[in-house]
Amino acid sequence: MKIYQDIYPISKPSQIFAILPFYSGDVDDGFRFGGLGRWYGRLVALIILIGSLTLGEDVLFASKEYRLVASAQGDTEEINRTIETLLCIISYTMVVLSSVQNASRHFRTLHDIAKIDEYLLANGFRETYSCRNLTILVTSAAGGVLAVAFYYIHYRSGIGAKRQIILLLIYFLQLLYSTLLALYLRTLMMNLAQRIGFLNQKLDTFNLQDCGHMENWRELSNLIEVLCKFRYITENINCVAGVSLLFYFGFSFYTVTNQSYLAFATLTAGSLSSKTEVADTIGLSCIWVLAETITMIVICSACDGLASEVNGTAQILARIYGKSKQFQNLIDKFLTKSIKQDLQFTAYGFFSIDNSTLFKIFSAVTTYLVILIQFKQLEDSKVEDISQA
């Protein structure tokens, strides 16, 4: 049951907000996913869904009431802000709904890891993973966004008190769920990477041993069986988190693009904005981009690290393959699947998530930003033509 202890610090807040299913029991007697855990998750999902529909309707049909700087915003900026706010709502709602929908599969995956931990502990595995520093960094960035947004919405905008609360609530829920999702996945994936890395180290020792002994054959057989189970577990984690990752990365991509564009639009607003408004707008945009970038880095690096460990197993087995003919049939069963298709984490199959994902995202952001700037310039030129006429 070591896995439950390893993820305990992040598991409690994740359970409260229905990202991780509530399970009952203890380390000695085992854990169970009962009816109370199921209904709690469904209740949270229902509350979030109803709240999101209500908030989304107000944002969609009263978008002008949510304009942060009315004097500095044209039609393009207003539309972009509205879309961003709606994506905020959709993103955290889908994270909750997807997590609750996959709760049973999620728990079974954790239970499978716990069973394998018994074998690992018997073979000397004692490693633990802590992301305390990352937790401080990610939560500080999220808190910074919320603090700047509060200052800007409350003190600098003309938004009414009721809609100030609505907008801040939307931002809070999005930041909360994106932070919890990133930290939970990071903790779980890096713990898995440690376990697979430990097995890979044991597997690598077969290059230095006499492969003719029957005892070595049994040990290799056990290792390959456990590694096959870990590959299956890793694929299950991707299935459980795939929808959440898709909607989160979709929101992050749009937010990074939109906030970069809004910073540009504010800088080029000229006499329409005061210097104070320019500084505040850029500050809000920069903190948004920074927070989303940090969160994406946390997720991408975790996915890449775990996938690298899983795919590294096939490379080690390939080196052992030629040492003894009696090992070849055993190794073939693993290599046949692993060599044909390396493990990749994906956002529900739409795109892969690894260390190169951020580069691809920012390349796309740059292209999209150029298009938005051209639309802005076209809009400004039309306004000038009308004023001159």
UniProtKB/Swiss-Prot annotation:
Disulfide bond positions: none
InterPro entries (UniProt xref): 7TM_chemorcpt
Topology, Extracellular side: 64-82, 155-164, 258-281, 374-389
GO molecular function terms listed in the Swiss-Prot or TrEMBL record: ligand-gated monoatomic ion channel activity; taste receptor activity
Quote the tissue specificity entry. Answer: Expressed in chemosensory neurons of about 20 male-specific gustatory bristles in the forelegs. No expression is seen in the mechanosensory neurons. In larvae, expressed in the ventral pharyngeal sense organ.
Chain ranges passing through the membrane: 43-63, 83-103, 134-154, 165-185, 237-257, 282-302, 353-373
What happens in the null mutant?
Mutant males display robust courtship behavior in the presence of CH503-perfumed females.
Which keywords fit this entry according to its UniProt record? Behavior, Cell membrane, Glycoprotein, Membrane, Receptor, Transducer, Transmembrane, Transmembrane helix
Q: Where in the cell is it found?
A: Cell membrane
Residue intervals on the Cytoplasmic side: 1-42, 104-133, 186-236, 303-352
Residues modified by carbohydrate are N80, N258
Name any GO cellular component annotation: membrane
Biological process (GO) annotations held by this record are: chemosensory behavior; detection of chemical stimulus involved in sensory perception of taste; male courtship behavior; male courtship behavior, tapping to detect pheromone; monoatomic ion transmembrane transport; response to pheromone; sensory perception of taste; signal transduction
Name the membrane topology term.
Multi-pass membrane protein
What function is annotated for this protein?
Answer: Dsx-dependent essential component of pheromone-driven courtship behavior. Recognizes a female pheromone involved in the second step (tapping step) of the courtship display which is essential for efficient execution of the entire courtship sequence and timely mating. Required for detection of the male sex pheromone CH503 which is transferred from males to females during mating and inhibits courtship behavior by other males.
Give the protein family.
Belongs to the insect chemoreceptor superfamily. Gustatory receptor (GR) family. Gr21a subfamily.
Q: What is the protein name given in its UniProt record? A: Gustatory receptor 68a
What's the source species for this entry? Drosophila melanogaster
| Phylogenetic placement of the source organism | Eukaryota, Metazoa, Ecdysozoa, Arthropoda, Hexapoda
